[in-house]
UniProtKB/Swiss-Prot annotation:
One GO process term, biological-process aspect: urea metabolic process
GO cellular component labels: cytoplasm
Subcellular locations according to the entry: Cytoplasm
Organism this protein belongs to: Flavobacterium johnsoniae (strain ATCC 17061 / DSM 2064 / JCM 8514 / BCRC 14874 / CCUG 350202 / NBRC 14942 / NCIMB 11054 / UW101)
Keyword annotations from UniProtKB, A to Z: Chaperone, Cytoplasm, Nickel, Nickel insertion
Molecular-function GO terms, alphabetical: nickel cation binding; unfolded protein binding
A UniProt-annotated Pfam family: UreE_C
Similarity remark: Belongs to the UreE family.
Entries under SUPFAM superfamilies matching the protein: Urease metallochaperone UreE, C-terminal domain, Urease metallochaperone UreE, N-terminal domain
InterPro entries in UniProt: UreE, UreE_C_dom, UreE_N, UreE_N_sf
CDD domains, alphabetized: UreE
Function: Involved in urease metallocenter assembly. Binds nickel. Probably functions as a nickel donor during metallocenter assembly.
Name assigned to this protein: Urease accessory protein UreE
Length: 165
């Protein structure tokens, strides 16, 4: 089965009289445009997103018919939670994490990142309130360079030059 786009969110579908099958993925697989996986019920799934910037989210429906529905399930993992005491501290910790080019998630006014012992110790030593938790990382901050084309017409420089004409 080849999937080219997301059908919608699970809450938008009536699952009555349908088998709900889950496609389990790790948080870092949610941004991959091309991948092959097996659902929990053994269905082979090939994801081939044609548009750049498409990302799988927890409970996205990637296939639906009258009998079955396949839903994305982002697997929980060990994570670092930083609970900023103020908006200024939120900005500082996001800057520090982003400066190290680490993946960062914002959920429930907390900053989360995949657990790595050295990063946990560094954040704690820097005075931030940190905890190690087992949770689902779902709301990634788009802090890195966006996917882009390699043709001349898609470069930012080319677009600015066209505006200036």
């Amino acid at each position: 089965m080849i999937i080219n786009e997301i059908e919608g969110s699970l809450r938008e579908f009536d699952i009555t009289n349908r088998v709900v099958d889950y496609l389990e993925i790790e948080w870092f697989e949610s941004t991959k445009r091309i991948q092959r996986k097996k659902s929990k019920n053994g269905q082979e799934v090939a994801i081939k997103f044609l548009k750049e910037g498409q990302r799988l989210k927890h409970e996205d429906v990637i296939y639906a018919d009258d009998q079955k529905i396949i839903v994305v399930d982002i697997i929980p993992c060990d994570a670092i939670v930083v609970k900023p005491k103020s908006l200024l501290e939120m900005g500082n910790v996001c800057y520090e994490i982003g400066n190290k080019h680490l993946p960062m998630f914002i959920q429930n006014d907390e900053v989360l990142l995949p657990f790595e012992e050295p990063i946990f110790k560094w954040l704690s030593a820097s005075g931030y309130h940190t905890e190690k938790v087992f949770t689902r990382l779902t709301n990634i901050v788009n802090s890195t360079v966006q996917p882009h084309g390699h043709s001349e017409s898609s470069s930012l420089f080319f677009k600015i030059m066209n505006i200036a004409k």
